[in-house]
């Protein structure tokens, strides 16, 4: 196609259209209004959120579910800096995202003008790459490059656009994505490494599979299940990726990592071979839990990972396979079959069932311990039982939200969207809005602590405006309980900054925004409240369920590895030293 005359705004909009972008999230601003004016005609909906951080979290979840690189935007200066947290979270989640950042106009750069700051430096360390439009004629080209990098490197790319570069006349050729970025070029990996892996797996006595995010991205559910049954290998899910193996399969042993399943950890503890499929084996996701140092030091590790930067990054590997999770696993299946029939190990299967049943019994008993206020585990247990199979769960970070890792199971992929290792609060509800846009017919349930809810409740207004009927399960324990637990265990119950005494209830605020809401104070009312929430959701209403829970029933500290009892040297602080703590 020949080059045609257009404006930079039109050139960038045409790139978005050809990339299949149906919506952009953000808060409008004068810096990009010339391009914004084009979007309704182009078929791109602008979702106007109440805080730019929501824009990025929505698109993070949207991309994780659809696989499509998503786009968010903010006004230069404060609008763009409000995107920092959500972009950093997406970067650690390996989510392809294009972040459009209008910046100060070139004639005034360096004069500390209105809403001017060095946006490029801010985003350099939290994205895969920072790009700048050097001239209006390059606007379309730079945006195409952003999509190319976002897909290739699996993460956000920041595009800095001086606000005067949206205007003018340029000559641009409108290109299809397959003309400027590779589509589906991943392979199964090196044949020699695949052959080595096959020999190790065939000889393994206690192989264990860790199924990670790459399994979902590559649509490798069937392949992982097949190789697991060939090997009678228990399958553990990597940290906060609980939807990477079907929970109704007999080889499912649950997630690892903080508040994961002991059945998974004991299985890994016995492993002589670990087959990590689509997992980077992150440091936080493999730390000891429940005082179980479960990641085996002497096991042989076969790591299938599409990104060579993640191979052997935390744990030394025996066989590195740089390849697509689906294709590499399929090749291993073929090679194992060529070696002859692999018979199921009935004894091992019985052990797996025993460990699963022990874990299910343990977490149910913990949930059914009576309490007033309600035991928070009881809420998680009841809600997990009632979750529709096609529902999507989004989870925040914090004491209760992290405990959800023990209770929720999934039979389908792309059903668990978690805050992951960036660990910011104020994620679950905002991500839930994006998940609801991605799957309008699926119920979306957000698990949120009352601390995180203070950073989220304003977005009920967005949910109502755009008819996104997300169900927020808000746990009202009157405190930042993850940090409270640290002050209990390491600071002798000296509480500073942990309490959240007001409001008495969040429900009046939710109703004022236009949502439906129920405050639940008795355990026997949990199930009925959640069923009512599902009914309201089916009618198109956003829902807030406020569960009043016991703030003294707490999970272990997140970072036992990074905390220590206090030592104090100055006389005026000596009484705070751990040597004066009561002896247990």
From Swiss-Prot:
Keyword Metal-binding listed: yes
A molecular function (GO) term: flavin adenine dinucleotide binding
Signal peptide annotation: none
Alphabetized UniProt keyword annotations: Acyltransferase, Cytoplasm, Magnesium, Metal-binding, Thiamine pyrophosphate, Transferase
PANTHER family per UniProt: ACETOLACTATE SYNTHASE CATALYTIC SUBUNIT, MITOCHONDRIAL (PTHR18968:SF13), THIAMINE PYROPHOSPHATE ENZYMES (PTHR18968)
Main location: cytoplasm
Gene Ontology, cellular component aspect: acetolactate synthase complex
CDD domains in the cross-refs: TPP_PYR_POX_like (cd07035), TPP_Xsc_like (cd02013)
Catalysed reactions, semicolon-separated: acetyl phosphate + sulfite + H(+) = sulfoacetaldehyde + phosphate
Entry's Gene Ontology BP terms: isoleucine biosynthetic process; L-valine biosynthetic process; taurine catabolic process
Similarity annotation: Belongs to the TPP enzyme family.
EC number(s) from the headed UniProt entry: 2.3.3.15
Assembly and interaction partners: Homodimer.
UniProt-listed Gene3D superfamilies: 3.40.50.970, TPP-binding domain
Pathway: Organosulfur degradation; taurine degradation via aerobic pathway; acetyl phosphate and sulfite from taurine: step 2/2
Annotated protein name in UniProt: Sulfoacetaldehyde acetyltransferase
InterPro entries, sorted: DHS-like_NAD/FAD-binding_dom, Sulphoacetald_Actrfrase, THDP-binding, Thiamin_PyroP_enz_cen_dom, Thiamin_PyroP_enz_TPP-bd_dom, TPP-bd_CS, TPP_enz, TPP_enzyme_TPP-bd
Names of required cofactors: Mg(2+); thiamine diphosphate
Highest classification ranks of the organism: Bacteria, Bacillati, Bacillota, Clostridia, Eubacteriales
Protein's cellular compartments: Cytoplasm
């Amino acid at each position: 196609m020949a080059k045609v005359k257009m404006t930079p705004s039109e050139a960038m909009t045409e790139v978005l259209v050809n990339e299949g972008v149906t919506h952009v999230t953000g808060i409008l601003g004068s810096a990009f209004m010339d391009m914004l004016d084009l979007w309704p005609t182009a078929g791109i909906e602008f979702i106007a959120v109440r805080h730019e951080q929501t824009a990025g979290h929505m698109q993070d979840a949207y991309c994780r579910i659809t696989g499509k690189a998503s786009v968010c935007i903010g006004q230069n200066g404060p609008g763009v800096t409000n995107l920092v947290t959500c972009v950093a979270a997406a970067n650690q989640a390996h989510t392809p995202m294009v972040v459009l950042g209008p910046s100060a106009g070139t004639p005034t750069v360096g004069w500390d003008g209105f809403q001017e700051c060095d946006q490029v430096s801010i985003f350099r360390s939290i994205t895969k790459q920072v790009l700048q439009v050097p001239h209006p004629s390059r606007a379309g080209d730079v945006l195409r490059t952003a999509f190319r990098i976002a897909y290739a490197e699996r993460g956000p790319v920041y595009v800095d656009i001086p606000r005067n570069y949206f205007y003018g006349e340029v000559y641009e050729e409108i290109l299809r994505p397959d003309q400027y970025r590779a589509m589906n070029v991943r392979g199964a990996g090196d044949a020699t490494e695949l052959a080595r892996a096959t020999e190790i797996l065939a000889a393994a006595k206690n192989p264990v599979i860790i199924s990670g995010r790459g399994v979902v991205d590559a649509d490798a559910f069937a392949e992982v299940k097949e190789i697991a049954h060939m090997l009678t290998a228990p399958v553990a899910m990597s940290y906060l990726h609980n939807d990477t193996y079907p929970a109704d399969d007999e080889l499912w042993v649950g997630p690892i990592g903080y508040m994961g399943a002991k059945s998974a950890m004991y299985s890994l503890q016995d492993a002589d071979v670990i087959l990590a499929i689509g997992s980077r084996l992150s440091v936080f996701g493999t730390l000891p839990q429940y005082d179980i140092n479960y990641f085996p030091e002497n096991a042989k590790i076969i790591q299938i990972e599409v990104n060579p930067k993640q191979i052997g990054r935390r744990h030394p590997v025996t066989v590195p396979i740089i390849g697509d999770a689906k294709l590499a696993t399929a090749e291993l299946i073929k090679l194992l079959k060529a070696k002859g029939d692999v018979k199921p190990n009935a004894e091992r299967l019985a052990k797996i069932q025993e460990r699963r049943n022990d874990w299910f019994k343990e977490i149910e008993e913990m949930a059914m311990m009576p309490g007033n206020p309600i035991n928070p585990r009881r809420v998680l247990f009841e809600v997990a039982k009632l979750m529709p199979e096609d529902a999507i769960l989004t989870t925040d970070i914090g004491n209760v939200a992290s405990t959800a890792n023990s209770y929720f199971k999934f039979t389908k992929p792309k059903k668990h969207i978690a805050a992951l290792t960036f660990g910011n609060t104020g994620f679950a509800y905002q991500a839930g809005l994006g998940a609801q846009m991605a799957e309008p017919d699926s119920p979306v349930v957000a698990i949120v602590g009352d601390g995180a809810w203070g950073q989220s409740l304003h977005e009920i207004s967005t949910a109502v405006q755009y008819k996104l009927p997300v169900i927020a399960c808000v746990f009202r324990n009157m405190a930042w309980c993850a940090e409270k637990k640290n002050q209990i265990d390491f600071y002798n119950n000296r509480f500073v900054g942990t309490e959240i005494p007001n409001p008495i209830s969040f429900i009046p605020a939710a109703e004022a925004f236009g949502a439906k809401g129920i405050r639940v104070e008795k355990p026997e009312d949990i199930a009925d409240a959640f069923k009512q929430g599902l009914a309201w959701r089916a009618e198109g209403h956003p829902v807030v369920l406020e569960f009043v829970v016991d703030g003294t029933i707490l999970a272990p500290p997140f970072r036992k590895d990074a905390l220590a009892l206090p030592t104090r040297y100055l006389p005026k602080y000596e009484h705070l030293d751990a040597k004066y703590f009561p002896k247990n």
